[in-house]
Amino acid sequence: MSNFAIILAAGKGTRMKSDLPKVLHKVAGISMLEHVFRSVGAIQPEKTVTVVGHKAELVEEVLAEQTEFVTQSEQLGTGHAVMMTEPILEGLSGHTLVIAGDTPLITGESLKNLIDFHINHKNVATILTAETDNPFGYGRIVRNDNAEVLRIVEQKDATDFEKQIKEINTGTYVFDNERLFEALKNINTNNAQGEYYITDVIGIFRETGEKVGAYTLKDFDESLGVNDRVALATAESVMRRRINHKHMVNGVSFVNPEATYIDIDVEIAPEVQIEANVILKGQTKIGAETVLTNGTYVVDSTIGAGAVITNSMIEESSVADGVTVGPYAHIRPNSSLGAQVHIGNFVEVKGSSIGENTKAGHLTYIGNCEVGSNVNFGAGTITVNYDGKNKYKTVIGDNVFVGSNSTIIAPVELGDNSLVGAGSTITKDVPADAIAIGRGRQINKDEYATRLPHHPKNQ
């Protein structure tokens, strides 16, 4: 039989105090909704339907054509949200997973186990449950003396006795699809919230003598539903530990994993060493045997094998094998550094390609440049690329030596094997094999300093 999935993503999330829909808040680099969608993929659903409501267009942009969408214009409860999927799913034979879009920690493995449990026990409904010593706020699982599930009672509707129950409802279920939509026609709003509860379907199945079961999570953390910023931070912390543990198992060394922040889609090869306070974001890829020292920040970039990045920022760029960067360097978007390039302290590179074995040791700005191989930039070199309106390109050939404190004003080209004298301002092309000197000639005026007020003779 087929599997189907319903993701509930219509809520506003008032307690988040945000203009952004709750399910779009990010955990480890992607939205909570994307985490849930990826986990749902483990059951290989034939159809996935996402229920949207508050700022539906923003939610739909995230999953685009990966799912079908239905709109819940009024948020009248989880049961009402599932009713909205009736035009797509009613009458289909199979098993339907219902899951909230604000549960980013649920794993695909747990959802697959839930479906298998449901099928193997021939249940008409199976509840994903968890156990906790602090069940406040959760719906409780009420069982009879034979441990059979009788019903789910919400916190606001629970008796004092029921509030002592430690087994809680995670808000995730599997139903026989046809029976689900038949039962939904019989639920009502006679409860403290005045809403249609999906949990009332469980009571209906029990009344008709149909089999209802519960599968208990092994890890309570997976049950976390995010309703405010506190829970969001908790989810981030748990996810970070999972991610770092995965990388350590795969051969990556962490000096302090609790102080290292790695997004879920980051790829790291074995033998990489990561010091504390390193942040790796987006689609970043790190090659084998690279070292990332304290304070390094990398986003959406590729770093090759054997590189050393020291307390520096790299954004949307590529760094080849054996490159050294930093400390205190900034590689800005759309830059590429060839093999064995050295970018030293207080060097900024923006929108530039730099050939292999080129060195910019300190205090240099390289912007909108095409730089060849074996180039040396002296300290204080500035490429001037902006005239206040337009940006221009500088082309520097192979084996060029640029003396310290030079200013290269684009658009200009320095030919292969050329040399720029220290302190020069270059405004014209420099031919290959030429030396360019663009500075004022030094003049010494003997004894002139004795006329100045700061001279010891005048004190």
Curated annotation (Swiss-Prot):
Residues 1-229 are annotated as: Pyrophosphorylase. The active site is at H362. It comes from Streptococcus pneumoniae (strain ATCC BAA-255 / R6). Its EC number is 2.7.7.23, 2.3.1.157. In the N-terminal section; belongs to the N-acetylglucosamine-1-phosphate uridyltransferase family. In the C-terminal section; belongs to the transferase hexapeptide repeat family. It comes from the Bacteria. Residues 251-459 are annotated as: N-acetyltransferase. The lineage of its organism: Bacteria, Bacillati, Bacillota, Bacilli, Lactobacillales. The gene is glmU. This is Bifunctional protein GlmU.
